[in-house]
Amino acid sequence: MKNILLFFSLIALPLAGCEQVIDYELEQGTEKIVIEGLVTDQPGPYTVRVSRTLGYLQNGRTPGIADAEVTNSDDKGHSEVLQAKGEGIYQTSELVGTIGNTYFFKVKVNGQEYTSQSYLKPVSILDSVTYKFKEKNAETDEGYYATIYFQEPKGKGDYYRFNIWVNEEPEDDIVAINDEVYDGNYGDPEIDISLKKGDKLRVEMLSLDRAGYDFLRVLGTMQYYTGGPFDAPPSNAPSNISNGAIGYFGASAVTIINSTVK
């Protein structure tokens, strides 16, 4: 067995530029296709990255596949073949993410076909941020802690992912929640990051379908796996892609709020 570090960037927006590092345990010599893609209701273009685990690079980023055929479509009859941009990146030119649409993608590599789909659910609006100062204790560092607010719609089955930046630097933590606590109520999750006066906070909340939520929950487990005597890493790499590929293809609506600690 060997461990392979894979850098996943799919769950960040194109403007985000942050990556998640996932440690996969694969059989020696095993090759896996890795596919990463995200469609949002923000202006495109959107990208899909296609790579393979065998022969991974020194920095852990999997080598891109240059000769894949990548198609993205929706349930309204729109379809386009993505343009190759190098290093395994394939980019849309006309696709526009729309709430309520289901998006499909198909990747062909060496005669093998890999598919997935995702429904673009609406997202609640982040309407405000407050800060509370906390003294240092056994569980928290001294500083200001942000609480964000949004009206969660009634009806269970909503899922969300948060991307967080402090002073334009992305935070690494994977934060995904469901609506079990907030269903139909005013959501007020606290961000567990110590801030100081003058810090600039940016929070993006992305809607997820159930497959996206499950994927991120497993990613979070893998990210925080410590290797202790009572811990065990997940036996399977997370994926919502057919035919044994690793990775995730998703569709998300996005809401953004910016704030400064005063």
Q: What are these model-predicted stretches?
A:
Residues E19-K262:
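A sequence/structural signal for flexible, mid-protein segments enriched
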Residues M1-I4, Q20:
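Positively charged n-region of N-terminal signal peptides that target proteins for export
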Residues P14-G17:
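C-terminal motif of bacterial Sec signal peptides marking the signal peptidase cleavage site
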Residues L5-S9:
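Sec-dependent signal peptide hydrophobic core
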